[in-house]
Regions:
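An active-site-proximal beta-strand-loop segment
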Residues: 84-113, 119-121
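C-terminal domain-tail junction helix/linker
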Residues: 5, 162-164, 188-239
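Basic, flexible linker segments flanking DNA-binding modules
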Residues: 1-84, 175-176, 229-238
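Active-site beta-loop-alpha junctions of metal-dependent nucleic acid enzymes
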Residues: 97, 115-139
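RNase H-like polynucleotidyl transferase catalytic core
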Residues: 143-148, 163-181, 197-202
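Acidic/histidine-rich, metal-coordinating catalytic segments
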Residues: 139-154, 228-231
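Short small-residue beta-strand/loop micro-motif enriched in glycine and branched aliphatics
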Residues: 110-115, 169-171, 195-196
Length: 239
């Protein structure tokens, strides 16, 4: 058969075994992402529904999935890269000490433009994170999307945004899921990187997160952008 064309009507035993084996190695990826990863790696070429059936029969899939509310989903989706940059702050617990992770995510490509882990995250720290993101893409004039945290409502931050040639919009306090892309990213990072990696120091955490973000940006296929990597999407290689 043509190995590049997914089949849905029959599977050979070796293909079923390969699917199950691949799932055990990548249990956090989800069956759809695994389908495209297996195609990319020339393991098997079958449809997502076939992968779902094989994994369901093997008892490997959860029977439920949490549906996200569409209510207050916020802004229209960006049509181009560097149109929307989402910024958010999250806590990282490293051996009982809390540090601050601030990430900047491109809304179109899901690419992590910049991130920093710091011992404090005042308004001036957030400015520095955004400034370094801008230095990577000097021509970008994104709309910055944030929540209503004190760093983002400060007068100095508003002035920084104006001087930098960017614009800023804050999510509704009642519908913070408008910044859900970045909140999901932070949840994924903690679940797949920080907690399993159990870093023992701030420096170790920084190295661990840096390595994971490189994998996420350059290797991991993203379901929301058509199962290409964020870097492929950012650089126009999705077709």
């Amino acid at each position: 058969h043509n190995g590049t064309v997914p089949r849905d009507h029959w599977l050979e035993e070796w293909e079923k075994e390969s699917i199950v084996k691949f799932w055990y190695k990548n249990p956090l990826e989800g069956y759809r992402r695994c389908t495209y990863m297996m195609m990319d790696q020339d393991i098997v070429a079958v449809s997502p529904s076939s992968v779902y059936r094989v994994l369901s029969k093997a008892g490997l899939l959860k029977r439920w999935s949490k549906k996200e509310s569409r209510k207050g989903s916020g802004f229209e989706q960006p049509l181009a890269i560097h149109e929307h940059w989402h910024i958010d702050i999250s806590y990282l617990n490293i051996k009982g000490t809390f540090y601050y992770l601030c990430s900047v995510l491109d809304g179109c490509s899901r690419y992590i433009v910049h991130h920093e882990i710091r011992e404090s995250m005042k308004e001036s720290d957030v400015e520095m994170v955004l400034q370094r993101a801008k230095e990577k893409y000097p021509a970008a004039r994104p709309r910055i999307i944030s929540d209503n945290g004190p760093q983002f409502i400060a007068k100095d931050f508003k002035e920084f945004i104006r001087i930098s040639g960017m614009t800023h919009v804050r999510t509704s306090p009642y519908y913070p899921q408008s910044n859900g892309k970045l909140e999901r990213w932070h949840k994924t990072l903690k679940g797949e990187c920080v907690r399993p990696g159990s870093p023992l120091s701030l420096q170790e955490a920084r190295e661990l997160v840096e390595k994971y973000i490189q994998h996420y940006n350059e290797k991991r296929l993203h379901s929301a952008i058509g199962y290409v990597t964020p870097m492929d999407k950012l650089e126009g290689r999705e077709n």
